[in-house]
Amino acid sequence: MNYLDFESKIKEIEDKITSLSHVFEDEKTEVEIKKLSKKRLELMESTYSKLTDWQVVQLSRHPDRPYFKDLLPLIFTDFQELHGDRTFGDDLAVIGGLAKLNNKPVMVIGQEKGRDTKSKIKHNFGMMHPEGYRKALRLMKLAEKFNMPVVTFIDTPGAYPGIKAEERGQSEAIARNLLEMSALKVPVVCIVIGEGCSGGALGIGVGDRLLMLQYSYFATISPEGCASILHKTAEKASEVTQMMNITSGRLKELKIVDEVIPEPLGGAHRDYETTATNIRKAVAAELKILSEMTVEQRNSRRYDKLMSFGRFKEA
């Protein structure tokens, strides 16, 4: 397992437990392991109860954190992937298709970063091209046609900023998704499972309900990007994070996020199954409520929610 810098003391105890577990078992060893396990639990509860916002960002990027492809088979059944935007190509930074949630059909769409070097390159580190947003929209429109709820999983450092992406209309593709998602006639639930950064996240993040895993973040810019603008150096990222209000708890207080999904003690990477179960229960509960509303009721609430964000004046 990989450890973050603030987890060094936890690592020391877990290394001791692992070392002792390989020793011939006797009563003395068993007692020592129990003592260390209790100490580890107390230390973890203390550590994770007072995380800084920057530490939450670090957890959201943990190399062992479950990605969309890890969670997909644990939450849904009968997944059938659908490919391509029918205009340019098939962007593998986003995966989508038909699936069942508790035996009910849904359209599931998620950003995938990739685990190792080969898969990271394949999925472009979760940074979608315009054809990715158009593929996602095509699947949403298909879901609308067949009256299926849409569930999206957000985990991206941002939309791909390359020249080719700009030439193919990156900003238009994202803007089009914002427009179309705000008016979809089926329930839409969006979940931030790791990084939810900039327009790259918004492009599949407009819906009736926005949920976040406990140790994820949702921001208009990464902490490093913000620090580079304000302080001319990314090294100030940990400082600016505190004033950005980008963690799940802070965004829940600001009413940007509707629900925070709890993670296992120590983060989602320590227990994929429990994380997936928590997500499945949360999404199922939201869809049950939304499915009992009429299209007019849902869209009216969605509109009111979107219009409540921020303030502006006409000059």
Swiss-Prot record:
Coiled coil: none annotated. Residues 36-289 form the CoA carboxyltransferase C-terminal domain. GO terms for cellular component: acetyl-CoA carboxylase complex. Its EC number is 2.1.3.15. It catalyses: N(6)-carboxybiotinyl-L-lysyl-[protein] + acetyl-CoA = N(6)-biotinyl-L-lysyl-[protein] + malonyl-CoA. It is found in: Cytoplasm. Its main location: cytoplasm. One of its GO terms (molecular function) is ATP binding. It is an enzyme of class 2 (transferase). Keywords: ATP-binding, Cytoplasm, Fatty acid biosynthesis, Fatty acid metabolism, Lipid biosynthesis, Lipid metabolism, Nucleotide-binding, Transferase. The keyword Transcription regulation does not apply. Pathway: Lipid metabolism; malonyl-CoA biosynthesis; malonyl-CoA from acetyl-CoA: step 1/1. GO terms for biological process: fatty acid biosynthetic process; malonyl-CoA biosynthetic process. Component of the acetyl coenzyme A carboxylase (ACC) complex. First, biotin carboxylase catalyzes the carboxylation of biotin on its carrier protein (BCCP) and then the CO(2) group is transferred by the carboxyltransferase to acetyl-CoA to form malonyl-CoA. NCBIfam families: accA, AccA_sub, PRK05724.1. Belongs to the AccA family. Acetyl-CoA carboxylase is a heterohexamer composed of biotin carboxyl carrier protein (AccB), biotin carboxylase (AccC) and two subunits each of ACCase subunit alpha (AccA) and ACCase subunit beta (AccD). PANTHER family: ACETYL-COENZYME A CARBOXYLASE CARBOXYL TRANSFERASE SUBUNIT ALPHA, ACETYL-COENZYME A CARBOXYLASE CARBOXYL TRANSFERASE SUBUNIT ALPHA, CHLOROPLASTIC. This is Acetyl-coenzyme A carboxylase carboxyl transferase subunit alpha. It comes from Francisella tularensis subsp. tularensis (strain SCHU S4 / Schu 4).
